[in-house]
Amino acid sequence: TDIGILAEKIRWLGTVRYTISSLFYIFNIKKRYGTLFINNKKFKENYLFVLIANTKYTGKGMLIAPDANLNDGLLDLIIVKNNINKFALIKLLPKLFTGEHISSQYVEYKQVKSIEIIPEKNECLNIDGEIYGTTPVKVNISNKKLPIYFY
């Protein structure tokens, strides 16, 4: 979310704004702590950020969740741990485009039915590139259900 908020403020720079925002974020890392309920099991976590996906790709071609499948009834959960140093984080960024980031010791990748995030301090939510609402947040997946609205 931090990257997205800054990127919106410098939108006039075009697509390079995400690279600039990412670098700014790396040098101003905000470590987070909170409680996660993963499939209704409670975990205390230290993390930089938590990302929930239902498709393989996000942004401009980032293979963020290589095992994601729209039809499997699962959410893909990516947790970047806050014990990562700045150098390791810089090395990790290019791997987001190949999916190799999920094998990093600093990344936890799981497929789950539900996730609830209750951070120590509430944060803005970035939902599909839009800042919308704040934490805490609970996300569930409903298998093979898609609401259709007619106007």
Regions picked out by a protein language model, each given a short descriptive name:
Residues 1-151:
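Long C-terminal subdomains/extensions of small-metabolite kinases
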